[in-house]
Amino acid sequence: MLNLKKVIALVCTLALVITSVSVVSFAEAYTDVTESSAYYEAVESLSKLGIVTGYEDGTYKPEETVTRAEMAALIARIQGYEETAKANANTVFTDVPSTYWASGYVAQANGQGIINGYGDGTFGPDDAVKYEEAVKMIMATLGYTPYAMNNGGYPTGYLAAAQFYGVTKGVSNAVTGTGANRGTIAQLLANAIDTPIMGQSKWSTDGSVEYTIYDGKDNNSYKTLMSENLDVVKLKGVIKESSVANLKGTKEINNDEAAKIKVAVTGNYDTNNKDFQFDSDGDYTGEDTFLVAESDAEDYLGMAVILYVRENDDNEYEVISIAADGTKNDIVTFTL
């Protein structure tokens, strides 16, 4: 352990050769989801955001099938509606009484047009949610129903939209017509919350509606569930300082202070958050110091990164997720 108040002249040159990017590091939350697990990054990120939870024995059970009621609850969480939707509510389905644990989630998702029943008045809350049903619910949540309906409807149009916009990226061994497991659902949700949402942008007097995908292109703003519903800000930049080192070779160390990183922010993905803005000259004037929290953000010193931060109860921003920026990193050399 370092107990020095100042570290000077630990002089060594480090050449960081980046051959693989898209790495997110956290302390493992579940005994059955290790770094070698296919859905490790997705499960860990969603756990940090409070979207998925594990079991009392410390496991996540990624191979266990998700039910339709559980999927309705997850849909509420990725929209930030957990508190309002979890209360018991009346539903239109004969097999989902107000006393059912997920009645509030089911009622809300049905009211939003995200979920449907079987056509006989039932919902089948304890039935396994099929892969294509889960994809449909997610893409409808993102606003892509008009796109899907113009490209084959259910399920073809929704599956096509999910593939085209990257929601199914990293999903393996998922088969339509079969129940989706917790690992697959985690990957879909992790992709979805960082996917540009689609929404109505223009209404005409003749009743026609124009839709926009808010992907930051063609003068459109950049909007995702993370930015609009979960209060998570996406940034890019270079980490220039950690709690123990910086790129100048000297660093004051305070053992009583929580670990932080300092970032030279180069992009804010058009966030509307006032704490992360550039001035009229293009100079960044926003927050640039973030709590490391449970991430391994300090391991990225000197690297170009994409990071996600969120304000905590103490009004400080902490790192939720971090990854090397594959479009920027090649070889970075610095001296400590």
What are these regions, as identified by a protein language model?
Residues 327-336:
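Alpha-solenoid helical-repeat scaffolds
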Residues 44-52:
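Mature N-terminal segment immediately following signal peptide/propeptide cleavage
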Residues 68, 182, 301-302:
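Short, flexible surface segments
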Residues 289-307:
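Short nucleic-acid-contacting surface segments enriched for D/E, G, S/T with interspersed K/R
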